Amino acid sequence: MKTPGVYIVEKSAFPNSVVEAATAIPAFIGITENAQNGPDSLSGKPWKITSMTEFQQYFGGAPSPVFTLSVGEAPVEDEKVLFSIPSSDGTKALKVADTENPFSLYYNMVMFFANGGGTCYIVSVGTYAEGAPVDKEKVVAALAALEKEQEITMVVVPEAASTPDCKDIQGQMLAHCGKMMNRFAILDVQPKAKANEVMSEQIDKFRTNVGANFLSYGAAYYPWLNTSVLSDKDIDGSVLVWDKSSTPDLTPFFAPGSKFPKYFEETYSISPPARRS
């Protein structure tokens, strides 16, 4: 930032002979629907893209959102429950909970490009069909592969915070950036381990886990921002599953004569919880 004063700025009459280049090129590591370039597998290989269309071409689409329906005692004191409908006598609650899903890379890419992102690298370390979260050994291999790409300036593993190996993965990210000395790691503070955990406890735990090495090569952004990239067309009855194989009696939750209980019974009576891809 300049201090107050008078400055002389000379404007060139000739066009700029220097070609503009991207100053921030991130590398994203995570789980994708697939990883294919025609007949060639892209699994574990850094792949350069410039748009969401290219991401979908090589790495597929989004994981299917799933919300779990259940009936339990009222009041509801579960942070995973998005909302609940009380029964007429107030003793029961029909709950709609967000199902834990470790696959978030796709939505991070949507946000990246929607906010002006351009050139980046993708390294797929697994698929939705495998049903497993990010594996730390595969992340280590992906980081080793990124050593050959000198233009990368940031490293991101969006799904690391949702795995029990978060500490090790983030440590490896910092070590990689410290070794390369031309990039830094963007880290996430893990979600609450328990409902009554306060913000200071989360931060202290994060600082302990990342250790004391290569801290100048990383940045953590906190608290989390609640947002959504889903549209109306992404939400319909197919995203709801029961937490049990049989449907409970729903008549106490709706007015007499309501068609909703019958609708739920016919639609979801044989829908056990499952992660779909």
Task: Name each model feature, range by range.
Residues 1-277:
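Surface-exposed assembly/interface segments
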